């Protein structure tokens, strides 16, 4: 177990004692947010986050609000990144936590984590939590200035990377055999799987990202020929995620029609409430109808040009049937 933890830490550029095993990203997010805030209750109860976060972050923040915490959401710019000036305006002496996702799961937006960390240097009592679940293998992980980072590879098990000098309140109590912050004996097989999954995700990363980026550009160029198509993902998003809307057609309709042709696309994030618009798309576009029409294409380094060509043929048939 020690060798595996050393291997994971080396891959992430962290110290072995900074690695905490959890059941998944939801637990990692809850442990980080609740653990930080509860350990900082003597400093303050003010938290800053965004409307783009995973439901495990939103749920944890709601629970903390019920315990008397105050939560402010930083504005989102049109390109999907947070408004850094608004973040500066929201920060207070009693702000104890800023919680930001590294990569948005619906749009693929890459948040400026290093710039956020630099801003927080002037607030030594404020901790930065980063949900990096969507970032591993898609972009460079930034650990400098980050106090806690959630990872789920993907999604059979979880990790929380916690800065070694940071004290948080545990949420699961017991013997604390491997760490005082999370009781419960980790499963060796799952821990070994994390190391292997991380190694596979990070090997040849630059070449793989370049391959996916080329496919993304091809998709954008071809889909842009359809007058009712609107891209929601910014140009500088991770290329693995392409979110779009077809004006006047609900995303669920396209999802069902494409599904009949064995094409799988996503409508919102997996943990969203059914029947509601994508909160990420709405946060960027401020357009409820557009958000309801949105859906996401996912690409990987295993996707081929032939598969893109086949998808475009199927999309063309679906577009003619649903949008005209």
What are these regions, as identified by a protein language model?
Residues 1-324:
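Pyridoxal 5′-phosphate
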């Amino acid at each position: 177990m020690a060798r595996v933890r050393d291997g994971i830490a080396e891959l992430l550029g962290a110290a072995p004692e900074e690695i905490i095993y959890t059941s998944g990203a939801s637990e990692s997010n809850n442990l980080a947010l609740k653990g930080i805030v509860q350990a900082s209750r003597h400093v303050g109860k003010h938290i800053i986050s965004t409307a783009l976060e995973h439901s495990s972050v939103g749920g944890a923040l709601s629970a903390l609000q019920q315990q008397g915490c105050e939560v402010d959401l930083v504005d989102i710019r049109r390109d999907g990144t947070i408004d850094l000036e608004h973040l500066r305006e929201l920060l207070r002496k009693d702000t104890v936590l800023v919680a930001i996702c590294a990569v948005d799961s619906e749009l693929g937006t890459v948040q400026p984590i290093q710039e956020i960390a630099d801003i927080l240097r002037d607030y030594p009592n404020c901790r930065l939590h980063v949900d990096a679940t969507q970032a591993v293998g898609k972009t460079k992980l930034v650990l400098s200035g980050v106090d806690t980072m959630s990872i789920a590879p993907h999604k059979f098990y979880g990790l929380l990377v916690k800065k070694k000098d940071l004290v948080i309140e545990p949420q699961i109590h017991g013997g604390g055999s491997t760490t005082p912050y999370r009781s419960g004996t980790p499963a060796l097989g799952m821990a070994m799987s994390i190391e292997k999954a991380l190694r596979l995700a990070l090997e040849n990363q630059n070449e793989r990202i370049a391959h996916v980026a080329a496919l993304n550009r091809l998709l954008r160029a071809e889909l842009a020929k359809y007058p009712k198509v609107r891209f929601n993902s910014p140009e500088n998003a991770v290329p693995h995620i392409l979110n779009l809307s077809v004006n006047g057609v609900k995303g669920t309709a396209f999802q069902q029609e494409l599904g009949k042709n064995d094409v799988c696309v996503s409508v919102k994030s997996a943990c969203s409430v059914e029947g509601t618009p994508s909160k990420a798309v709405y946060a960027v576009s401020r357009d409820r109808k557009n958000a309801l029409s949105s859906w996401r294409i996912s690409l990987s380094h295993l996707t081929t040009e032939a598969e893109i060509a086949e998808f475009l043929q199927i999309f063309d048939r679906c577009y003619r049937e649903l949008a005209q």
